[in-house]
């Protein structure tokens, strides 16, 4: 769990993914379309993959990936991110991390 907490607070927006996950890719594209360059951790390339998955689930993710953190706080998985986006609540949350040059 410590590793996940450390990794999730490295940058403003952090997404834990797996390289074969299409929903992970969709969430990454959403953030890029919103002018945010998230830090991506592909956990299937990490030797601690299983432990990271377990930690993400313990933190409250409905699925281990994608797991989105903003400002070091868990936002959630695909359902939570898309719900925030559709309700208009995602952009204010990520505003400090948007790039004007992106």
From Swiss-Prot:
One of its GO terms (cellular component) is nucleus. Its main location: cytoplasm. SUPFAM superfamilies: Thioredoxin-like. Residues 1-101 form the Glutaredoxin domain. InterPro entries: GlrX-like_pln_2 (IPR011905), Glutaredoxin (IPR002109), Glutaredoxin_subgr (IPR014025), Thioredoxin-like_sf (IPR036249). Disulfide bonds join 21-24. It comes from the Eukaryota. One of its GO terms (biological process) is cellular response to nitrogen starvation. Has a glutathione-disulfide oxidoreductase activity in the presence of NADPH and glutathione reductase. Reduces low molecular weight disulfides and proteins. This is Glutaredoxin-C13. It comes from Arabidopsis thaliana. The gene is GRXC13.
């Amino acid at each position: 769990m410590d590793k996940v907490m450390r990794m999730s607070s490295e940058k403003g927006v952090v997404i834990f993914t797996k390289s074969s996950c299409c929903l992970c890719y969709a969430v990454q594209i959403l953030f890029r379309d919103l002018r945010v360059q998230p830090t991506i951790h592909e956990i299937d390339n990490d030797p601690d993959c299983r432990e990271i998955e377990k930690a993400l689930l313990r933190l409250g993710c409905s699925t281990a990936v994608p797991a989105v953190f903003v400002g070091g706080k868990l936002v959630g998985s695909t359902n939570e991110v898309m719900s925030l986006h559709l309700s208009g609540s995602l952009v204010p949350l990520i505003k400090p991390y948007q790039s004007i040059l992106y």
